[in-house]
Amino acid sequence: EKNKIRPRGQRDSSYYWKMEASEVMLSTRIGSGSFGTVYKGKWHGDVAVKILKVVDPTPEQLQAFRNEVAVLRKTRHVNILLFMGYMTKDNLAIVTQWCEGSSLYKHLHVQETKFQMFQLIDIARQTAQGMDYLHAKNIIHRDMKSNNIFLHEGLTVKIGDFGLATVKSRWSGSQQVEQPTGSVLWMAPEVIRMQDDNPFSFQSDVYSYGIVLYELMAGELPYAHINNRDQIIFMVGRGYASPDLSRLYKNCPKAIKRLVADCVKKVKEERPLFPQILSSIELLQHSLPKINRSAPEPSLHRAAHTEDINACTLTTSPRLPVF
């Protein structure tokens, strides 16, 4: 019965992206994140396999997961980690391109890579470009942070771990998936408060991006003076604390400083959206002396059509700080 081929017209579009567990060989365990464990694997070459923390998914969860996969498979952009397929046997899992580069978190806070200001601005632009693309596809990232941004072959940004609301949401009834404990620093106040059934929005992604921008422009994580995670949750959730902009580099352009301030506004309606964010960074780049502009990559201009299957790491990032 199982092996009978259904007429083509009756197939869910996600059917063609389903992988059999037997086809994918898992090798090294790379690390564990808020929503699952990442392995390096082989499937016609190197891939990253994320086994999601969803035990015994309900039929509703399974269908919601398939619906989301149908959206993810349509994503093709130079600044987005390529989605390659999914598995449902034993565990829900997604398969993406493998990437040898380090996460932005690792570059900034572990290796302490010394970037020049024009490079930091370009990382910010590419990240905004990738996020603008996701939002245009109506995909909310829900876990945007420096651990989920990878620098591939030098300075090409790849955003990973996007979408998958099924896994990142609380489910009523027996299935409850807790909010990520490691991502507190990047969570918008309204997400921390969790007063709405679904506090995630384009604006909550913008807030998280604002924290990434702060990391780029300060070289450190926000709230470094508060080493108590619960205190950060309380202070940010109530609107008593926001990133200290006096910590930004002295040579940080005013336009970027304003952008950080706007992105992390406590009232979500006051935050800009990615088309505006991207425009303001591009405007700034055009005003910089030519010697400080990074060489444009031809691939960036055909981003929407690019199918970049080069290797890209899903997570070589270290453990998150206690917050």
Swiss-Prot record:
GO molecular function, one term: protein serine kinase activity
Pfam families: PK_Tyr_Ser-Thr
Chemical reaction(s) catalysed: L-seryl-[protein] + ATP = O-phospho-L-seryl-[protein] + ADP + H(+); L-threonyl-[protein] + ATP = O-phospho-L-threonyl-[protein] + ADP + H(+)
Catalytic center residues: D143
Domain Protein kinase: 24-284
Gene3D superfamilies: Phosphorylase Kinase, domain 1, Transferase(Phosphotransferase) domain 1
EC number(s) per entry: 2.7.11.1
Positions annotated to bind ATP: I30, G31, S32, G33, S34, F35, G36, T37, V38, K50
Disulfide-linked positions: none
Note, other: This protein is synthesized as a Gag-Raf polyprotein.
Protein's name in the database: Serine/threonine-protein kinase-transforming protein raf
Natural source organism: Murine sarcoma virus 3611
Gene: V-RAF
